[in-house]
Every structure is written in structure tokens, then in C-alpha cells.
Regions:
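Short N-terminal targeting/anchoring amphipathic segment
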Residues: 144-163, 179-181
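Membrane-proximal helix-turn-helix segments that form the acceptor-binding/catalytic region
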Residues: 188, 203-225
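Conserved acidic donor-binding segment of nucleotide-sugar-dependent glycosyltransferases
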Residues: 385-393, 401-406
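A charged, aromatic-enriched C-terminal amphipathic alpha-helix characteristic of glycosyltransferases
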Residues: 404-438
Length: 443
């Protein structure tokens, strides 16, 4: 019996297994049965382990009828725009859900949220349920109790899919009509592989294959997949050619530049800079060490404005430089967009769509970016501004050329605006998202 059951039950995160053992519910020799109990008896165990018998909601002010499809959206945290890291895109998805004939709920799974209803509703739609008290322990109990309630579950980010993979398979067996939508955005393993190559510590061929196999396995439970770009869609399609894959990118509203060429003088970098090993921190440090000194020799009047949360310890030396200004989190970026002559995106490894690049382009700021980002954006007209990160001298000269050449600056400014107006409109994102739900008979 044990053998047959174990074949049917997918793995449960080790953290939950340990909690069961620590509570004395099971002995260590019964660890395999912990997996079974977590799924079969999730209601009991979830409440016992978390002490969370009731889930507090911020309930929707108004809902559609009971016959409307019920869709649960799971991401790491409440998707405030200032967080970056894909959260602005999640906020747009919430906005779209709020406009459809569905009853939507949202769970910020990874980070506790103590924001008041008024705070939540000032940033997000008020006709969505926000289940703020759920966490990585109580989610299993909740999903078990609601196993016959939801018609679709949207899961964002690979680590969330990995964490919930086992219980999602169980829910699919219990309710075959349930639709699982995996908002993968991109294959993150390729970023990790590129990161190690960039740092001069490449993974072995076997390690690369293992990472790819592990991540692509997460897609197997999905009835539909979201990618953020056509290039990411092609990568995923290589592994799952028969699963519907929709490009759900982002929407950005374009703005004609407030200031012209001669009223601008700064370089601008925007991004979250809290983690030392993040692509943003790596790229900024590389730029400031390898590129910025050469730019300053040719443009001594230039300053570098850095906007975004910046708590990474590796940034401390940069904060002492007079020519580099850290401005922290800013709710409004208009002032910085208006002052910037050149936007820099020196990313050396990444996956997905760089929303900060789209934001700068939407304000008519020419961008100097690495080939990594240029490829992700599929931005052929901007090819002259895509520089391999190892070519530091070329990156420097491209920055200086845009800074000094008014005609070239105007040309690149207009090309960026045209690209945003054709590739990142609200209508395109709305239609792509709605079509994806229609394909699953959810609308």
C-alpha cells in the first residue's frame, strides 16, 4: 500500500515534512507517510501546524454572480509597482481580472502583508478577494478545503510552482475540470546558467541539463502557460509543443519627452538593488567599475542617478561617490525621466522582459543596453545600442555618442516611442490575456 500511494503522491516541500516531525505528529521512520497525510489530511494538519483556523480576507466590494468562473491568482507578494521584479505586470493582470466576468482571488504567498483594506484598495481593484493571512504552511490546508471551489489557478514564478506542484496534481485528480495556468514568464534556469558563465564559474554540462530538466518538469501540470516575450515562448515551446502558450508581456503608456536634448544632462539607472547576487546589483557594479570612469573622463559634468530600493551591501562604496546619486524608492519617476539624457541597462544575465527598459523608452529616453536585453526585447531597430557586456570600450563610446549627438539622440528617442506604441499597449495585453482564458473555456 505504501509503495502504490507514494507513486501517486508528488513530493511535498521538506520544510513541511520537518514541521510535522517537530510537532511529534509522525516519527521519522514514517516520513514517507507525511507526504500522504499532508495531501489526504491537509485540513487537519494545516490547522494544527499553523494554528490558523480562520483565514482573514479583504473581501471584494462587489462580485459577479455565483455562476461566474472563480479564478485564484498566486504570486509572492502584493504587487506594488515600486517593487519592480515583475510585480508591475502582476498588478496589471489583477486589473484585467477585475474587468472580466469572473470572481477573482489573490494570495501573496511568500511575504506577509499587513496592509489595511484602504491601503490595498488604493493600489489594487476592490472587486477582488485578497487572502492576506495565508502563507506557505497554511496554503495546503486552504487549497484542500477549497478543492472543489476554484475553476482556475494562476501560479506565478517557478519557485511557487515548485512548492505547490504536488498539491496541484492532487487537485487536478480530484477535480479534472480545474485549469492550472502557469505564469512562468521565462525559463529562469537559463539565467542561472548565464550568470555562472558570466562570473567565470560555469556549470558542468550535467549540471546544466539537471537545471533545465528540473524547471521544464514544472510545466507538466499546466493546462496553459504564460511567457513574457516571443523568444521565451519559443524556448518553452521546444519542451511543450502541445500546451497553449500565451505571450502576456506588459503594457506601458508612452509619453512625449518633456525636455529636449539640451535640457538633459544625467545618466539614469532604475531597478531594485536589495540583493547582492541579483542581476541588477551585478550590472550596476560592473557599469560603475568598468564603464563609468571612462565616461566621466570624456563627460566630467555627467552624473549618474540611481532610483530604486538599494540595500545591497556591495553598493556601499558607490554611495560615497560625488558623481553617483542614490535616490531610493520613488513613487513618481517623472522628475528623473525628464532629467535623463541616457538610460543605461548594463545587465549581464537575466530572463524575461526588462520593464525598466520599456519604462525609459516610453518616456523617449535613448537606452544603451547589453545584447542580453536586446535579444529579450527583440528590438531590431535598436541593434546599434546593444553591446556585449565584455566590450566595455564600445559600451562607453555608445553612451558618449548619444550624450553628445543631438540628431542621434532624437532618432533613438523616437524609435523607442514607436516600439512601445506597437508592442506594449494596454489593448494588446488585455486581448492576449482574455484569449488565453477563452481557450480554456473560462470566459
Amino acid at each position: 500500500m505504501q509503495s502504490s500511494l507514494l507513486k501517486k503522491i508528488s513530493k511535498v516541500p521538506l520544510s513541511l515534512q520537518k514541521k510535522i516531525l517537530q510537532k511529534g505528529i509522525l516519527q521519522k521512520r514514517d516520513l514517507s507517510f507525511a507526504k500522504i497525510l499532508l495531501l489526504k489530511c491537509a485540513s487537519y494538519l494545516g490547522d494544527r501546524l499553523t494554528g490558523n483556523n480562520n483565514c482573514e480576507y479583504i473581501r471584494a466590494v462587489q462580485r459577479n454572480g455565483e455562476e461566474a468562473p472563480k479564478i485564484l491568482f498566486i504570486d509572492d507578494r502584493m504587487p506594488y509597482d515600486f517593487l519592480g521584479a515583475g510585480y508591475p505586470r502582476s498588478r496589471v493582470i489583477l486589473n484585467i481580472l477585475s474587468k472580466l466576468k469572473v470572481n477573482a482571488s489573490f494570495i501573496p504567498l511568500g511575504f506577509a502583508c499587513n496592509d489595511s483594506p484602504s491601503m490595498i484598495h488604493s493600489h489594487f481593484p476592490d472587486n477582488i478577494d485578497y487572502l492576506l493571512s495565508l502563507n506557505k504552511d497554511s496554503i495546503f490546508s486552504f487549497l484542500y478545503k477549497k478543492r472543489n471551489f476554484f475553476d482556475a489557478i494562476i501560479i506565478s514564478r517557478p519557485h511557487n510552482m515548485e512548492y505547490l506542484y504536488g498539491v496541484l496534481k492532487y487537485l487536478k485528480r480530484y477535480k479534472p475540470s480545474l485549469k492550472i495556468i502557469y505564469d512562468a514568464e521565462a525559463l529562469i534556469c537559463y539565467r542561472e546558467i548565464l550568470k555562472q558563465e558570466t562570473l567565470g564559474q560555469p556549470f558542468s554540462t550535467e549540471k546544466q541539463k539537471m537545471l533545465i530538466d528540473q524547471e521544464k518538469a514544472l510545466f507538466s501540470v499546466a493546462d496553459s502557460i504564460y511567457a513574457v516575450s516571443p523568444s521565451e515562448k519559443k524556448l518553452i515551446q521546444n519542451y511543450y509543443p502541445d500546451t497553449p502558450i500565451s505571450v502576456i508581456s506588459h503594457c506601458v503608456e508612452s509619453h512625449q519627452p518633456i525636455n529636449g536634448f539640451h535640457k538633459r544632462e544625467n545618466f539614469l539607472f532604475i531597478g531594485r538593488l536589495n540583493e547582492n547576487d541579483s542581476p541588477n546589483v551585478d550590472s550596476l557594479i560592473w557599469f560603475c567599475q568598468e564603464i563609468w570612469p571612462s565616461i566621466r573622463k570624456q563627460l566630467p559634468q555627467a552624473k549618474l542617478d540611481i532610483v530604486g530600493l538599494a540595500e545591497a551591501s556591495q553598493l556601499k562604496p558607490l554611495k560615497n561617490q560625488d558623481d553617483i546619486n542614490f535616490h531610493g524608492r520613488q513613487d513618481c519617476l517623472d522628475e528623473f525621466y525628464a532629467a535623463a539624457k541616457v538610460f543605461i541597462a548594463p545587465t549581464r544575465f537575466a530572463a524575461g522582459i526588462p520593464l525598466k527598459v520599456c519604462g525609459a523608452a516610453s518616456h523617449g529616453i535613448p537606452i544603451v543596453m547589453t545584447e542580453v536585453l536586446l535579444t529579450q526585447l527583440d528590438w531590431p531597430k535598436y541593434s546599434s545600442l546593444g553591446v556585449h557586456w565584455q566590450q566595455s570600450s564600445q559600451f562607453t563610446q555608445t553612451c558618449v555618442k548619444i550624450y553628445n549627438d543631438e540628431e542621434y539622440w532624437n532618432e533613438m528617442s523616437q524609435q523607442g516611442l514607436e516600439y512601445i506604441n506597437t508592442q506594449y499597449t494596454k489593448e494588446q495585453m488585455y486581448r492576449s490575456f482574455v484569449t488565453s482564458l477563452e481557450q480554456l473555456n473560462l470566459l
